[in-house]
């Protein structure tokens, strides 16, 4: 057997070293170029945002405060009232999906509240598994049919019931093996915009205002705030105030936004930004942009921290502009990647394939560099205390400081820069959608009565008895309201 000569080995090593050198040098050049451009555009948008029209900042992911959402809705209603610009409510829909009969009562409760109590004019769309109405696969078809009749009777025209095929993960025996069926919401293309809701939740007010987010936004949702610590919050405040040199008082943003909405001006660049420290791997945006795409980045990403961003989009409430193109990509490209992976479900696909926060920055910046005036952002972050609160947070004191200020990196301060005291009851009073999540506690319909799972303070273990009693009372009131609502499902 002929051995490779030393000369040939040296030649191969030389070639490999040359390739490596070219790669590293080119990466450093790109890194330097990106850094220079990013510095320029950060300064550009800070100094010129007041006068910009149809030019959007690609270097940020924006959060929209609840006050601004309400201002947009009020402005749209005023156009209808004063200018006769009629809202086509048939182009909007609330959407639920049901693959488990135990959840169907919840849809009846939510749809009935939306129509009868909150008086929405939007369509109410239920995507329900065909299997639930098949006697060969379902043991309670009669009960399911009676609930469906009640749902349809809410309004014969406004309620739309669609029979669907489940998207099932093969060889997955977990309770979430059909959760990918949720992705069918992206295919409801007869509507311009839909509000998707998980129905294991309590709805406390209309969400109609979410239909009137800026038209260019294709996806908006709250974030998984429960992964954050108080240390993360403090870092985000420090980043906003010191590194970005922006005010952290949320009112300084909402006041400007209110005026701009009143004048019909662009608002995107004036929205508070999501602090980079919460979702990027380093303090250097250029570094993260490069590492977002380079297949060799694990080998050559010397400067990047290995810290993984804690924040993701929650998928229990989503505002979506459905499109055939997006759904085709989900079916043909994204689903095959995840179907056979263990412990990967709807939220994983949405955050890893569709709306990965880190990759969003990369895609925005690259597109902006190519055709600046054609770039439009597609995502917004919704305030989670109003649209994505978990019941578990009501009993978790570590979450209180987070839900008091649900635009991350910012606080509601008075004119002297002091925190405006916000109590737990006040914070929850603004919550419109509260998701049942108290693991290891089961969902409330699995218990014969409230007594089986009600919150009771153990005085001997209480660190702050008054606060814990307040939290328990609040938690119990949420569940008691739901238990009472279930009476509508009796047949």
Swiss-Prot record:
- CDD domains documented for this protein: GT8_GNT1 (cd06914)
The entry's localization annotation reads: Golgi apparatus membrane; Vacuole membrane
Q: Where are the transmembrane segments?
A: 11-31
What enzyme class is recorded for this protein?
Answer: transferase
Q: Example GO biological process term?
A: protein N-linked glycosylation
Place the motif DXD on the sequence. Answer: 198-200
Membrane disposition: Single-pass type II membrane protein
Show which residues sit on the Lumenal side of the membrane: 32-491
* An annotated Gene Ontology molecular function: glycosyltransferase activity
- The residue spans the entry assigns to the Cytoplasmic side of the membrane are as follows 1-10
Glycosylated residue positions: 136, 177, 187, 425
Q: After translation, how is this protein modified?
A: N-glycosylated.
Which Gene Ontology terms of cellular component type are present? Golgi medial cisterna; Golgi membrane; vacuolar membrane
Q: What is its EC number?
A: 2.4.1.-
What InterPro entries does its record include?
GNT1/Glycosyltrans_8 (IPR050587), Nucleotide-diphossugar_trans (IPR029044)
Q: List the keywords (alphabetical).
A: Glycoprotein, Golgi apparatus, Membrane, Signal-anchor, Transferase, Transmembrane, Transmembrane helix, Vacuole
**Sequence similarity:** Belongs to the GNT1 family.
Q: What does this protein do?
A: N-acetylglucosaminyltransferase involved in the Golgi-specific modification of N-linked glycans.
Q: What else is known?
A: Present with 238 molecules/cell in log phase SD medium.
UniProt-recorded name of the protein: Glucose N-acetyltransferase 1
Origin species:
Saccharomyces cerevisiae (strain ATCC 204508 / S288c)
């Amino acid at each position: 057997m002929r051995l490779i000569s030393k000369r040939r080995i040296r030649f191969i090593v030389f070639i490999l070293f040359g390739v490596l050198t070219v790669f590293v040098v080119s990466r450093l050049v790109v890194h330097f170029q990106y850094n220079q451009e990013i510095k320029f555009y950060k300064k550009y948008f800070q100094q010129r945002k007041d006068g910009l029209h149809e030019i959007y900042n690609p270097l940020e992911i924006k959060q929209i405060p609840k006050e601004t959402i309400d201002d947009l809705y009020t402005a749209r209603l005023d156009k209808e009232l004063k200018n006769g610009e009629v809202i086509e409510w048939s182009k909007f829909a609330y959407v639920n999906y049901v693959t488990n009969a135990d959840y169907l009562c919840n849809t009846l409760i939510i749809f009935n509240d939306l129509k009868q109590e909150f008086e929405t004019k939007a369509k109410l769309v239920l995507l329900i598994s065909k299997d639930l109405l098949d006697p060969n696969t379902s043991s309670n078809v009669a009960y399911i049919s009676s609930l469906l009749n009640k749902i349809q009777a809410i309004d014969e025209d406004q309620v739309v019931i669609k029979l669907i095929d489940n998207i099932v993960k093969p060889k997955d025996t977990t309770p979430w093996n059909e959760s990918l069926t949720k992705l069918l919401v992206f295919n409801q293309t007869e509507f311009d915009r839909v509000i998707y809701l998980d129905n294991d939740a309590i709805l406390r007010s209309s969400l109609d205002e979410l239909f009137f987010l800026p038209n260019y936004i294709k996806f908006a949702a709250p974030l998984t705030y429960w992964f954050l610590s108080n240390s993360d919050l403090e870092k985000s405040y420090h980043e906003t105030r010191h590194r970005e040199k922006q005010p952290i008082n949320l009112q300084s943003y909402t006041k400007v936004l209110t005026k701009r909405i009143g004048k019909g001006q662009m608002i995107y660049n004036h929205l508070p930004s999501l602090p980079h420290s919460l979702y990027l791997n380093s303090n250097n945006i250029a570094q993260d942009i490069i590492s977002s795409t380079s297949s060799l980045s694990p080998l050559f990403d010397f400067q990047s921290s290995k810290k993984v961003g804690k924040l993701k989009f929650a998928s229990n409430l989503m505002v979506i502009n459905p499109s055939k193109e997006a759904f085709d990509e989900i079916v043909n490209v994204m689903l095959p990647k995840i179907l056979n992976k263990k412990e990967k479900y709807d939220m994983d696909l949405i955050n890893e394939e569709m709306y990965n926060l880190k990759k969003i920055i990369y895609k925005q910046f690259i597109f902006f560099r190519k055709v600046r005036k054609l770039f439009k952002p597609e995502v917004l972050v919704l305030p989670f205390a109003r649209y994505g609160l978990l019941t578990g947070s009501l009993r978790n004191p570590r979450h209180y400081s987070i839900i008091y200020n649900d635009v991350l990196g910012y606080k509601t301060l008075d004119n002297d820069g002091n925190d405006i005291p916000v109590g737990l009851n006040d914070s929850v009073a603004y919550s419109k959608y509260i998701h049942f999540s108290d693991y290891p506690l089961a969902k409330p319909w699995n218990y014969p009565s409230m007594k089986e799972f009600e919150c009771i303070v153990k005085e001997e273990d209480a660190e702050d008895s008054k606060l814990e009693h307040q939290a328990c009372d609040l938690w119990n009131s949420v569940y008691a309201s739901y238990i009472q609502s279930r009476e509508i499902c009796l047949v």
